[in-house]
Each structure stands twice: as structure tokens, then as C-alpha cells.
Amino acid sequence: MKKQNLIDMEGVVTESLPNAMFRVCLDNGCEVLTHISGKIRRNYIRILPGDRVKVELTPYDLTKGRITYRLRAKSSNS
């Protein structure tokens, strides 16, 4: 169940840190320290630097967030 007061944003993973932490540069230019959500961890989804991701932020601390979705890379075949 999704919480009401979360802020959803998109960004690019710039750095992979220990303990499943990542540094993400959001589309508005802010750098955020994030961790991965339980569903991504449970399904063994790999997050690598350069991936586009969706991030949830709380209005209380805009410097930390949670990666909720890894966006698919656009294929160059079409």
C-alpha cells in the first residue's frame, strides 16, 4: 500500500555504495542518497551506475530516498 505523503521523482544512478546504497542524481539536479526497496531486493533486480530509476522521497528529509523501480533502457533497434 502506497503512502500518501511521498514524493516520486526520476533520476540516474551515479554511484554504487556498500550495503545496497546508491547515490542518485535527480532530474532537477539534486543528489540523493538512496537504498533499494524490499521488492527489488527480493526479486534480485540489479541496479548499476547509469540506470534510470524512480525514487520515493519523504517531505521530512529530501536528502535520502528509496529506489522503487528501475526503468527500462531504450533500445537502439527501433
Curated annotation (Swiss-Prot):
InterPro entries referenced in this protein's UniProt entry, alphabetically: NA-bd_OB-fold (IPR012340), RNA-binding_domain_S1_IF1 (IPR006196), S1_domain (IPR003029), TIF_IF1 (IPR004368)
GO cellular component: chloroplast; cytosol
Cited PROSITE patterns: S1_IF1_TYPE
Oligomer status and interactors: Component of the 30S ribosomal translation pre-initiation complex which assembles on the 30S ribosome in the order IF-2 and IF-3, IF-1 and N-formylmethionyl-tRNA(fMet); mRNA recruitment can occur at any time during PIC assembly.
PANTHER family: TRANSLATION INITIATION FACTOR IF-1, CHLOROPLASTIC
Family: Belongs to the IF-1 family.
UniProt protein name: Translation initiation factor IF-1, chloroplastic
